[in-house]
UniProtKB/Swiss-Prot annotation:
This is Mediator of RNA polymerase II transcription subunit 10. InterPro entries: Mediator_Med10. One of its GO terms (cellular component) is mediator complex. Component of the Mediator complex. Residues 124-143 have a biased composition (Polar residues). Keywords: Activator, Nucleus, Transcription, Transcription regulation. Component of the Mediator complex, a coactivator involved in the regulated transcription of nearly all RNA polymerase II-dependent genes. Mediator functions as a bridge to convey information from gene-specific regulatory proteins to the basal RNA polymerase II transcription machinery. Mediator is recruited to promoters by direct interactions with regulatory proteins and serves as a scaffold for the assembly of a functional preinitiation complex with RNA polymerase II and the general transcription factors. One of its GO terms (molecular function) is transcription coregulator activity. The lineage of its organism: Eukaryota, Fungi, Dikarya, Ascomycota, Saccharomycotina. It is found in: Nucleus. Its main location: nucleus. It holds the Pfam family Med10.
């Protein structure tokens, strides 16, 4: 079904381009006669109908503006796709690395939690000493 819709769209685009060429020929070779004016009006009406038909059969595909800019600059849109995929690959590798580090650190923390007990009261006491005497050096035994 998608291929048939694509083919219909291509055929309609070809017809529209042919109509535009005919209009340009009529405008270029205009003599100002009534027959020429009527022919031009008829071709313009045909063009409007063809644009309406294009609007009816258009594809509902979202095209990134960057791809359109690439095409406007005469560049190959496949280059944009390749660069975008490479960027996503780098980001994916970075996030995967972060996840690996988190998994390893979680495993290390779990394996050492039984061996190294946390002394919360010692840590809280040290923090109050530091905050109450900010100008003095901390004294005491470090265990």
């Amino acid at each position: 079904m998608a291929e048939a819709a694509r083919q219909e769209l291509e055929n309609q685009l070809r017809q529209t381009i042919e109509t535009l060429v005919e209009i340009s020929l009529l405008v270029h070779d205009t003599t100002g006669s009534q027959e020429n004016k009527e022919g031009l009006i008829e071709q313009m009406d045909t063009l409007v109908k063809e644009f309406q038909r294009l609007k009816e059969i258009k594809c509902d595909k979202q095209i990134p503006i960057d791809v359109i800019d690439y095409i406007d600059q005469g560049r190959n849109p496949d280059v944009y796709t390749r660069e975008f995929v490479e960027l996503l690959l780098k980001q994916n590798q970075f996030i995967h690395g972060k996840m690996d580090i988190y998994t390893v650190s979680k495993g290390v923390r779990e394996s050492t939690s039984d061996d190294i007990p946390l002394d919360i009261s010692c840590g809280a006491h040290s923090n109050t000493e530091i905050s109450t005497n900010p100008g003095q050096k901390r004294q005491g035994n470090v265990s």
